[in-house]
Design a protein with these regions (language model features):
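Mature extracytoplasmic or organellar-lumen-exposed domains after removal of signal/transit peptides
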Residues: 1-166
Length: 166
């Protein structure tokens, strides 16, 4: 559905839907694709590129969009900035989807380590407000992250049904 550039409330609703969907899969993306996850959901602060200290990378991804639509929205100029931020995310998501060896990564041990890591991340970054400093959606996003973990665990429940004790 198209987004009306003069309707910030519609933009916020679409953002919330996209970010919630991302949070549901964050248990896997944060662990198996950390560089892409940082680009998609890193903090809305500039950072220095590790290879060349003289290159400053501006904020990008969901948190930069959050800052734009919840704090800095200007109907005349912000829509183009929003479109650029969102468009930059698309190839990263497409590359993650097409990643050739993605099915080899998901050993049981690594998936359970991803779950452990995700729970730590939710409790240290998610529910503290660091992950959604402007929109203040940290708790709903933490719930979405836990829903993603629950869905993942349901797969393992089917693979390893509980043993019945006699």
């Amino acid at each position: 559905a198209a987004i009306e550039k003069n309707d910030p409330e519609s933009i916020k609703r679409k953002y919330t839907l996209a970010r919630t969907a991302f949070k549901k899969m964050a248990v896997l993306t944060d662990y198996f694709n950390p560089f892409q996850a940082r680009y998609l959901n890193g903090p809305a602060i500039s950072r220095i590129e590790s290879e060349t200290a003289d290159r400053i990378i501006p904020p990008q991804g969901f948190q930069a969009i959050e800052q734009l639509i919840y704090a800095d929205w200007n109907a005349d100029s912000s829509f183009n900035q929003l479109a650029a931020l969102a468009s930059a995310m698309i190839p990263i998501l497409q590359n993650m989807e097409k990643e050739p060896d993605r099915h080899f990564k998901f050993s049981q041990e690594l998936v359970f380590d991803a779950i452990r890591s995700s729970i730590i991340g939710i409790t240290t970054i998610g529910i503290t407000g660091f992950d959604s400093p402007v929109a203040n959606h940290s708790l709903p996003e933490a719930i979405a992250s836990f829903e993603g973990i629950k869905q993942l665990l349901e797969i393992y429940r089917e693979i390893f049904p509980a043993e019945k004790k006699a």
